[in-house]
């Protein structure tokens, strides 16, 4: 099974910059998960051939939002995590299949000065609780923009960014707790020591050209699936957003 996750930072903007349908066709992934779609119902007429499409919209216009394109029709689709205060921003879609749950997640940014860190920690706790409930039923593949660089190897300038949003002790510890609860960062499972592998670059100062980036987009899978991971990769050559797609090949 081939899965792709991409924070598009505005789907309409990406569709203006590239032939998005051709991209989907060329990649020929079984499942494609998008984050930060920034659209409302009816704003995009997009029905790729051979895919079932599911959208979760934020209440606030032009903000957040997720989508999943799946070749196989799921047994059920769950929008959000069942906690009203966390389900206003369209951040989670879960697809249930016979042998696995597939989730797309767009984790809230803690913002400059960590002004939203308290909410972020509440989100982390609620999300992990939800994931663990799913994992008791069948294994989970979670992907998306998790807005955290877990270790120093996961960003270009760790010392300069210590305790900035995305590299605070609280956020990194929350991700550690997630993994310790029985999950695997697929990219580090395959490439434990690979440096310079990033999925997001600031638009400022030519950061992408100089590869001054962060790895904040992930595929995280249940521990029981780790031996079925065949490859995990980052498609840094795909333009259109400040993030690039990340990919997982897994034997399901």
Curated annotation (Swiss-Prot):
Keyword hit for Nuclease: yes
EC number: 3.1.11.2
GO cellular component: cytoplasm
Compartmental location: Cytoplasm
GO biological process, one term: base-excision repair
Main location, first listed in the record: cytoplasm
Keyword annotations: Cytoplasm, Exonuclease, Hydrolase, Magnesium, Metal-binding, Nuclease
Chain positions of site Interaction with DNA substrate: 243
Site (Important for catalytic activity): 217
MF (Gene Ontology): DNA binding; DNA-(apurinic or apyrimidinic site) endonuclease activity; double-stranded DNA 3'-5' DNA exonuclease activity; endonuclease activity; metal ion binding; phosphoric diester hydrolase activity
Positions with a binding annotation for Mg(2+) 1: 36, 242
Ranges that cross the membrane: none
Cofactor note: Probably binds two magnesium or manganese ions per subunit.
Pfam families in alphabetical order: Exo_endo_phos
The keyword Ubl conjugation belongs to this UniProt entry's keyword annotation: no
Catalysed transformations (reactions): Exonucleolytic cleavage in the 3'- to 5'-direction to yield nucleoside 5'-phosphates
Positions annotated to bind Mg(2+) 2: 145, 147
PROSITE patterns assigned to the protein according to its UniProt record, in alphabetical order: AP_NUCLEASE_F1_1 (PS00726), AP_NUCLEASE_F1_2 (PS00727), AP_NUCLEASE_F1_3 (PS00728), AP_NUCLEASE_F1_4 (PS51435)
Cofactor(s), names only, from the UniProt record: Mg(2+); Mn(2+)
Marked site (Transition state stabilizer) residue numbers: 147
Annotated active site: 106, 145
Sequence similarity: Belongs to the DNA repair enzymes AP/ExoA family.
UniProt name for this protein: Exodeoxyribonuclease
Gene transcribed to yield this protein: exoA
């Amino acid at each position: 099974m081939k899965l792709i996750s991409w924070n598009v930072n505005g789907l309409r903007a990406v569709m203006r910059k590239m032939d998005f349908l051709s991209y989907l066709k060329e990649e020929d992934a079984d499942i494609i998960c998008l984050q930060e779609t920034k659209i409302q119902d009816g704003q995009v007429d997009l029905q790729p051939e051979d895919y079932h499409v599911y959208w979760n919209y934020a209440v606030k216009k032009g903000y957040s939002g997720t989508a999943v394109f799946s070749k196989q029709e799921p047994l059920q689709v769950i929008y959000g995590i069942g906690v009203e205060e966390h389900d206003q921003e369209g951040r989670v879609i879960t697809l249930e299949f016979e042998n696995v749950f597939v989730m797309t997640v767009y984790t809230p940014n803690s913002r400059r000065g960590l002004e939203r860190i308290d909410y972020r920690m509440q989100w982390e706790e609620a999300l992990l609780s939800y994931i663990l409930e799913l994992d008791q039923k069948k294994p989970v593949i979670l992907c998306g923009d998790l807005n955290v660089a877990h270790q120093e190897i996961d960003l270009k300038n760790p010392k300069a960014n210590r305790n900035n949003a995305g590299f605070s002790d609280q956020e990194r510890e929350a991700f550690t707790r997630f993994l310790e609860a029985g999950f695997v960062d697929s990219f580090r499972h395959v490439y434990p020591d690979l440096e310079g592998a990033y999925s997001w670059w600031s638009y400022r100062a030519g950061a992408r050209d100089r590869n001054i980036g962060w790895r904040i987009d992930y595929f995280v899978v249940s521990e029981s699936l780790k031996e079925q991971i065949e490859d995990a990769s980052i498609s840094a050559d795909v333009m259109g957003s400040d993030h690039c797609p990340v990919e997982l090949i897994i034997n399901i």
